[in-house]
């Protein structure tokens, strides 16, 4: 039987004892069946251009989410992306992570932070943002769907891909970039020599450019753990500024406890229908925000450090979210003024460690981990 409607948004309201599932549906006003092969909801597929002979290129430093989506956007607009990524492609990266999980050693350039897809590849793929600087969030969902994501990405209020499915989606993004004339250089950390060649619009000798191309600019898409790159940028007079961030710990609980608290003694049938419960906590302590972050129902805690002799963790869930444990970051906001001495303009860590003011936050992180 053909469908008369399709779900375009789904959310769960667990604030009251009686659980409510809210659906927004798309239907023909005359009740006619909808096309079977139509995406849910309808969206314009991307139009990627063949750029093998493009005259203009842009260099992208980092193949995390920002770098990959920047590359795809450039291809849609007729500009050839050239990506430099310090880590490995996703299949090789998985091997290094498996070695780390067996306590057999950390590869400082290929781990839960560095490599194709960035930290997000092995960090769950929750597609939700509290930021008011949201941009075109729906287009992000559509592109993930285009590269193999589930239909639920297009209508779930808190969409989730899963760390088991993300590597395949990321690989397909890379294949698309290469197919349309882009370049990706793995195991290539942008050091001072390469950075200077890029900003001076000269081609490094070890790239594989097949023809002359004019470099229009450089997009920095590096992650928070690339401390060495930030220091290199500062040494090359790139303007940097201290910004606020959040730090904390990760708490783990039995998933059954969270289900009971959020769903009010749910039946196994209900859990099967709506999935394991998640939560969000926000409060103020002495005028400072404290909140849960990256809550992972049915998830795992993983070693997410990228440097030796440090302790950093993250959380992730597979697509089915069926681990017996839930976990969430519990973090507090760190403000730029927290790094100052006597509320003046001299960062505290500048005084103690001879650190430049713009990099004081990085030094603070290093002291804690």
Feature-to-residue mapping (PLM):
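Residues forming the flavin
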Residues: 1-122, 126-207, 211-369
